[in-house]
Amino acid sequence: MLFTKAENLKRLPEGNNLFLREVRLEDSAQIIAWRNDPILGKFLTREKLTLAQQEEFFRKYQARVDDYYFIAEFKRSKKPAASIALANLDFAARQGEVARLIVDPGARLFLAEIFDLLFAFAFEQLGLSVVVAKVQSKNAPAKNFHIRLGFQIEKIAPNAWWNGDDVITFRMSREDYPRLKQAWSALLFDARES
């Protein structure tokens, strides 16, 4: 049974340390700070993002039914840990794409949990079969993390990014997720946020 976007957003997963919630307009300043950070945002964009641009993006996002945009938030402190989205949803093909991932430097230890929450939402709640993630080949930490989680390389598009970098499309299937989650479940520790 398919639910509307509004219904799906009422039933978001929680982990040991984090929960997902839909992004809100008031998150715009934090998202801009992350995106405009020279280290965090270096693989995202070539221009600085303005508050007006982010707010406009948020308004357009709200109208889309093929896009779920989240803030992963710490359960105890309610501090934002990351932004992450499940975008370009194709319900006929039962596929979605990881997008807009930015992890706060203080939350890097929780990256596996952030992905686990997104996978739970994608596979268990939306019933998707496949989640893909596009990563620049020069982004070694992201590339290595996707491999470590068990994503498979689906394809490599040469010179496909705005900076001329190759883009690797990684793939995680609904069938592989439970087995892989068991393999990396040690990364889902019950840490105490600082």
Regions found by a protein language model. Name each.
Residues K42-L44, F70, L180:
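Short, hydrophobic secondary-structure boundary micro-motifs
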